[in-house]
Amino acid sequence: MPHQQILMLFGLLPVATNISTWWNFGSMLLACLTLQLLTGFFLAVHYTANINLAFSSIIHITRDVPYGWMMQNLHAIGASMFFICIYIHIARGLYYGSYLNKETWLSGTTLLIMLMATAFFGYVLPWGQMSFWAATVITNLLTAIPYLGSTMTTWLWGGFAINDPTLTRFFALHFILPFGIISLSSLHILLLHEEGSSNPLGTNSDIDKIPFHPYQTYKDMLMLTIMTIMLLTIVSFFPDIFNDPDNFSKANPLVTPQHIKPEWYFLFAYGILRSIPNKLGGALALXMSIMILLTLPFTHTSKLRSMMFRPFMQLTFWTFTATFLVISWTATKPVEPPFTTISQVAALMYFLFFISNPIMGWLENKIMKL
């Protein structure tokens, strides 16, 4: 009976007829979250949060634990899949004006911040060379905060340098944050269904709706199958494709890597941080690169919701997408010309997208006499 009720609930959930594949990434994110929780639990069972044993415990998981290599690779590559899906999900929201559903957008941006924090803490756990130095660089940014900076950094580290207490608390945070993500995801979905999904046209969907099941369930299953095939192909044939070679060496505080860089999904934020020569300015720009998403629902001036019928805004959006990729590319390069100049121009263009959004909306209204 409960099974029938669940099916009936999905059957009665009305969805716009014309929503495209770009609306499938929400369910894919839910699948990624489930995968991360399951693999993460099995990894946590065998992991040791100690600076002398952490690196060895990862080697032990991959070599000695039955299917440990698969768990470790699924967890690491699953994180990359998670970020691919969330960036596409956000891009869809930007393009089709989904951010006008304010509560859903604000809860989603908070989810992104929590996800980035969780991924950062997780990257430190293997205690490889890049893990250690990435943690050193990013946590050191707290010292840029006037008056409180040094105290906050010491408090976060649990001492006067990154050491055993730092790793222990990072493991605790990496374990607890996903439960917050689950709670907020539930709220995100609840808030979404208060109003219902938007559609590519940006019009009111009430006039033409179909049941979620079987139409959208099959559509979701297709995309989930494609994602699973991609994930298992990478895990089986290219497990180290996203790994940094430096992270195969145990952390050594006495040797600095030639080029410190985070995982690929943080490169855009790291590129913006590096493009500003001032420490406090860089730290503020880093935070603002994410927080600026919160401004979108309040700066939308166009009478049209979606960018589908806004050619100027489409051009701006695709320029923004290219800018995102350029910043990510420059963040992998050393801090020297011409990369410094390119990253500074790209960082400026990144923020210009959000500034130009209300201006373009106003301009389009004038041209179309809306």
UniProtKB/Swiss-Prot annotation:
Matching InterPro entries: Cyt_b/b6_C, Cyt_b/b6_C_sf, Cyt_b/b6_N, Cytb/b6-like_sf, Cytochrome_b, Cytochrome_b_C_euk/bac, Cytochrome_b_N_euk/bac, Di-haem_cyt_TM
GO terms, biological process: mitochondrial electron transport, ubiquinol to cytochrome c
A family per Pfam: Cytochrom_B_C
Family matches, as PROSITE patterns: CYTB_CTER, CYTB_NTER
Membrane topology classification: Multi-pass membrane protein
Binding of heme b b566, residues: 89, 188
Residues annotated as transmembrane: 25-45, 69-90, 105-125, 170-190, 218-238, 280-300, 312-332, 339-358
GO molecular function annotation: metal ion binding; ubiquinol-cytochrome-c reductase activity
A GO CC term attached to the entry: mitochondrial inner membrane
Cofactor: heme b
Protein location: Mitochondrion inner membrane
Alphabetical keyword list: Electron transport, Heme, Iron, Membrane, Metal-binding, Mitochondrion, Mitochondrion inner membrane, Respiratory chain, Transmembrane, Transmembrane helix, Transport, Ubiquinone
Family the UniProt entry places it in: Belongs to the cytochrome b family.
Cited function: Component of the ubiquinol-cytochrome c reductase complex (complex III or cytochrome b-c1 complex) that is part of the mitochondrial respiratory chain. The b-c1 complex mediates electron transfer from ubiquinol to cytochrome c. Contributes to the generation of a proton gradient across the mitochondrial membrane that is then used for ATP synthesis.
Name assigned to this protein: Cytochrome b
Organism for this UniProt entry: Chilabothrus exsul
Name of the encoding gene: MT-CYB
